[in-house]
Amino acid sequence: MGRLILEHTLQGHKGRIWGVAWHPKGNVFASCGEDKAIRIWSLTGNTWSTKTILSDGHKRTIREIQWSPCGQYLASASFDATTAIWSKSSGEFECNATLEGHENEVKSVSWSRSGGLLATCSRDKSVWIWEVAGDDEFECAAVLNSHTQDVKRVVWHPTKEILASASYDNTIKMYAEEPIDNDWDCTATLTSHTSTIWGIDFDADGERLVSCSDDTTVKIWRAYHPGNSAGVATPDQQTVWKCVCTLSGQHSRAIYDVSWCKLTGLIATACGDDGIRIFKETSDSKPDEPTFEQLTAEESAHDQDVNSVQWNPVVAGQLISCSDDGTIKIWKVTE
């Protein structure tokens, strides 16, 4: 049986903490929250401490942050309807660009693997794709209006320029750029959840996606490409995503975030019942009918809702979480 061991409890933000994001090198992370501030934390010896506080970029709650793949830039999505781009080019972090266009709160932000594209989504039901046009220059490449409700999350595929979004309309959408006319189109709609989808994440090679929802379930989706050996039909030669596994009964309230570890294959969930749960694929799992078991759980990981969980991209088994209770926790998962 696995274990979830608490290594550090960190405080500093005022009010609820919405998001945490590991730097690609794994020795630094950023956090954001209700206090309109971003904190950059780093590890010295065995102690995590705040090195920088960025408090002049947003007028309202900061909902999510993400580092660029190169680690030079940090993007922050805010309820003030803007996305800020921060960099350390001058030695100190500063806001070098503010992306405007959304009509309401920006809920999520994500960099493509190449670092050349940025996606944002909002309560205004739209997903925007921005091209990095040069030093601190961003151009809107597409405005996608496929969802019928508030869009909660955007995540890029780990190897291809394919974007996934999750919404209050209970669906996940996939987008890709048409090679002929260079227009971004919705290429797939994933339906199975019965309530708001809060979080999505790809596995290491991007052939599977995990989602979590207000309906208290976690679902695993698999990509079936044209000519697949399973015989799954692919109309218009488009990849089809099918729900191949549903995990239910483990969570008692809405699941707000899910993270699929690229190093170990473990899945972590952040739940409104204050718990963190870790799932592992079973040894007899089949490609078209995968099975997962709960490896371990901490039912009272935080004193209030857990808003985000993120696996360290470098240190296998290290997990970070944040909560409405105003704390950040760093955990070690053993199998």
From Swiss-Prot:
Role of this protein: Essential component of the cytosolic iron-sulfur (Fe/S) protein assembly machinery. Required for the maturation of extramitochondrial Fe/S proteins.
Gene3D superfamilies xref list: YVTN repeat-like/Quinoprotein amine dehydrogenase (2.130.10.10)
SMART domains in UniProt: WD40
Similarity section: Belongs to the WD repeat CIA1 family.
UniProt GO BP: iron-sulfur cluster assembly; protein maturation
Cross-referenced InterPro entries: CIAO1/Cia1, G-protein_beta_WD-40_rep, WD40/YVTN_repeat-like_dom_sf, WD40_repeat_CS, WD40_repeat_dom_sf, WD40_rpt
Protein's recorded name: Probable cytosolic iron-sulfur protein assembly protein Ciao1
Species in which this protein is naturally found: Drosophila yakuba
Keyword Repeat in annotation: yes
WD repeat segments: 12-51, 57-96, 101-140, 146-185, 192-231, 250-289, 301-335
Entry superkingdom: Eukaryota
Record GO cellular component, one term: cytosolic [4Fe-4S] assembly targeting complex
Keywords: Repeat, WD repeat
CDD domains assigned to the protein according to its UniProt record, in alphabetical order: WD40 (cd00200)
Xref: Pfam families: WD40
